[in-house]
Amino acid sequence: RMGETICVSWLKQYNIPVKIVRPFHTYGPGMALDDGRVYADFIADIVNNRDIVMQSDGSAMRSFCYLADATIAFFLVLLNGINGEAYNVGNSDCEISILNLANKLVSLFPEKGVKVVTKNTQNINYLKSAVSRNCPDMTKINNLGWYPKTKINEGFYKTINSYEKIL
């Protein structure tokens, strides 16, 4: 939020037009599969025919927004947003637990024979998110007329297929 504060300060002090977007778990073709985000790890596992090994109980809830939808939202905010305002960009219709996401991704590519493996997470040292649910309030950007179009199955299928074509 420090960047947002600096931008709004420039708006107020120098009248520099500023609009702020807050992307929520945006994914799609071209994303780095080694960036440490759980869904990037899951995609890399499927692309490389590896089982998905859960590093937590998978109960954290997240909403995912396909890159093409997010890009349209970014431009809409740039062109029609109010200076100094922040707009959440996400897909509140695509909220899913991390465990259910792993199972869903595996089910999209049954021919790969990949499965979800759960560990006993009682004694495991993993970075646990302090946020158990992260679903954006989309009211402000919806008021600009933006609604994401891509469902989670379609978006992740396209994303994984894009990496399959590269390999």
Model region roles, listed by residue range:
Residues I16-R37:
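Flexible, glycine-rich beta-alpha linker
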Residues R1-E4, G36-A40, S63-F64, E95:
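Short-chain dehydrogenase/reductase
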Residues R1-R22, I43-N48:
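Active-site Tyr-X1-5-Lys
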Residues V8, G30-L33, I98, G145:
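Short, function-defining helix-loop hinge/capping sites that tune catalysis or transport
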Residues I46-L167:
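C-terminal substrate-binding subdomain of Rossmann-fold SDR/epimerase-dehydratase oxidoreductases
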Residues Q13, D35-V38, L79, E164:
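Residues in and immediately flanking transmembrane alpha helices
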